[in-house]
Swiss-Prot record:
The keyword Nuclease applies. This is Ribonuclease Z. The active site is at 67 (proton acceptor). The gene is rnz. Binds 2 Zn(2+) ions. Belongs to the RNase Z family. GO terms for molecular function: 3'-tRNA processing endoribonuclease activity; zinc ion binding.
Length: 310
């Protein structure tokens, strides 16, 4: 599991940062990629990565401001040209369906794959299968804005091979049966339960990806115990008034959310063009006393999300 940042800027593109988009790379977990937001030129940023558009199976839109959605029509069309024929689902606030369908209709674009929309009207679970659960919560922005919590299901425990050997169980196909938790009859007549030879499950990982927002309790709820929290930091430490007036957050407010939520790491994005180079990095330095594991991300950064140590 990795996060690859395709755009980390705020409002409009700059020479250093494109507008909002990131990819949650789930190639090992489900041979797929999930996009979160799709600002202008997202597909151009993808050209600088190993991402294949046909691997994108879901797109989660946080809100309908242009810097988060203007890249959608182009990306969806290019996915058709590049061999994408599997269904794609777009999640987002009410209005996302009208936006996409209008753009495709006016441009007379035809997609080679089924396109499904899930429009959000409130807080709750928006997707669940055997491997992942995605929950959305409303944030505090000028228009409807959501954050997403992606929870991975626990992985089965490993077969404790040494314990199996000590029990005198011969190697071979029996090991596979035990690993599946089956009750097995051994050649010597003994009956053993596979569950007795399997270690504790490995807890799944949790990623919280927030849209534009002011300070809100829902941000803390989304980030509770997260391995990684992606939070906007449009404004610096001492600009609380500006942040409030423009419905955004400061770096300090983002760090406070991470601390309250008990998150493991904080990745600051949605960085204003006023902060360039070391001035952008200072957004992280100024909050290390609040939340040490803080980093300002840049376009095309790839962040590994390992399992927690047992």
């Amino acid at each position: 599991m990795q996060i690859e940042f395709l755009g980390t800027g705020a409002g409009s593109p700059s020479k250093q940062r494109n507008v909002s988009s990131l990819a949650l790379r789930l190639l090992e977990e489900r041979n797929a990629i999930w996009l979160f937001d799709c600002g202008e030129a997202t597909q151009h940023q993808i050209l600088h990565t190993t991402i294949r558009p046909r691997k994108v199976e879901k797109i989660f839109i946080t809100h309908l401001h242009g810097d988060h959605i203007f890249g959608l029509p182009g990306f969806l069309s290019s996915r058709s040209f590049q061999g994408g024929d599997e269904p794609l689902t777009i999640y987002g606030p009410k209005g996302i369906k009208d936006f996409v369908q209008t753009a495709l209709k006016v441009s007379e674009s035809r997609l080679s794959y089924p396109l499904k929309f899930v429009e959000l009207t409130g807080d709750g679970e928006v997707f669940k299968d055997q491997t992942f659960t995605v929950t959305a919560r409303r944030l505090d922005h000028k228009i409807a804005s959501f954050g997403y919590r992606v929870e991975e299901a626990a992985h089965p425990g490993e077969l404790m091979v040494e314990k199996v050997r000590q029990a005198g169980i011969p190697s071979g196909p029996l090991y596979g049966q035990l690993k599946r938790g089956e009750v097995v009859t051994l050649p010597d007549g003994r009956t053993v339960d596979g569950h007795d030879f399997i270690g504790a499950p490995q807890p799944g990982r949790i990623v919280a990806i927030l849209g534009d927002t002011r300070v809100t309790d829902n941000a803390v709820k989304l980030a509770k115990g997260a391995d990684v929290l992606v939070h906007e930091a449009t404004f610096a430490k001492n600009e609380q008034r500006l942040a409030h007036n423009y419905y955004h957050s400061t770096s300090v407010q983002a760090a406070t959310v991470a601390k309250k939520a008990g998150a493991q790491r904080l990745l600051l994005n949605h960085i204003s063009a006023r902060y360039v180079g070391r001035y952008a990095n200072e957004l992280a330095y100024q909050v290390r006393d609040i939340f040490e594991q803080t980093r300002v991300v840049n376009d095309l950064d790839v962040i590994e999300i390992p399992f927690k140590e047992r």
